[in-house]
Amino acid sequence: MRVWEDVNGLQIKGKFVREIFGSIEVQRPNGDLHSIPLEDLSPEDLTYVRTLIPPDVVVSVRAKESVKDRNEEFIWANDKLTVVTAEVEVRKKSRSPYQGTLKAEVYLIGKEMVTGAYTLVGKGTSRVHFTEENKGRYTFNTSATYRVYEEYNNLETRGAEYEGYLAVVVDPQGNKLVQESDLSWLLDENIDALRQFYVGIFFDETCKKRSVPRPRYYDGRERF
């Protein structure tokens, strides 16, 4: 419940219902609806409305891979480091101004070489603001390093390669506004579980945790 005030000083106590056709609807304590044109709202109330209603947004991700620069003296044979940089863009679709803050999240997934399990290699978050300068397009970058190497005298290839991404945008209350992924196996009902993972954890296609993969070398040693 809020006390609204128009530019003429008229005060109305009520709960915000919606914005429609250039006005807002407020529900009074007795249940009646009252309409107030946006241009008649006080500056404080207009700012409140512009932070209350999250806009329609879309999110897109462009992932680029590059070989990590390393000191040649410390490079082992068959030891590859790849940096994946994800450029995330959040674009406001709705025309109504929005002065609040959204949160964007991006998760970079790898696929383990030995078992095929998935692992969270990197993640990043950013506070999303739409301004006159960015014209409703907010971008940020997140990077993660993937390592693939041979172990035990080249008997086994270990590490993880880049598999894909998940991007999510939420409103100030934590409600999801939009999500985007290039992982065909990642179902909507499993996304929240993945968002709770920490970097380095292993999991399967249903986003259930798995134990750290152990080298097959130990099984092979028993046969000798």
Feature-to-residue mapping (PLM):
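Compositionally biased alpha-helical segments
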Residues: 1-129, 153-164, 189-198, 202-209, ...
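Short, solvent-exposed, Trp/other aromatic-anchored flexible loops in extracytoplasmic proteins
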Residues: 121-190
